[in-house]
């Protein structure tokens, strides 16, 4: 009974250590702090895009002096275009033109 408990406990720690090793900082990168928040949008509906633009404009008008302004960048191709763009920017570790929110 002790052997089974010990083996189960050991295998749990082994699995946990593998997960922690996979989550290491090897692939990490930081963006350049450019003083703004870039919001990527892949909205295909003009009404939805206009509504998002109105919300961002209102936020930029009422934000505090220490808060970053928000800019919207449009990603073409809908959700598929957004996914492809995100994968590309992550794989090349784009530090300067990468967006902060999607």
From Swiss-Prot:
Keyword Signal among UniProt keywords: yes
Lipidation (S-diacylglycerol cysteine): 23
GO cellular component: plasma membrane
Record keywords, A-Z: Cell membrane, Lipoprotein, Membrane, Palmitate, Signal
Residues covalently joined to lipid (N-palmitoyl cysteine): 23
Its membrane topology: Lipid-anchor
Family of this protein: Belongs to the MG185/MG260 family.
Protein name: Uncharacterized lipoprotein MPN_363
């Amino acid at each position: 009974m002790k052997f089974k408990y010990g083996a189960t406990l050991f295998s749990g720690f082994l699995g946990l250590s593998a997960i922690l090793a996979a989550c290491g900082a090897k692939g990490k990168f930081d963006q350049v702090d450019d003083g703004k928040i870039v919001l990527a949008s892949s909205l295909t509906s003009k009404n939805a895009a206009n509504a998002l633009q109105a919300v961002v404009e209102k936020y930029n008008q009422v934000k505090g002096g220490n808060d970053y302004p928000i800019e919207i960048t449009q990603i073409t191709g809908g959700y598929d275009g957004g996914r492809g763009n995100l994968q590309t920017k992550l794989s090349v570790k784009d530090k300067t033109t990468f967006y902060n929110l999607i």
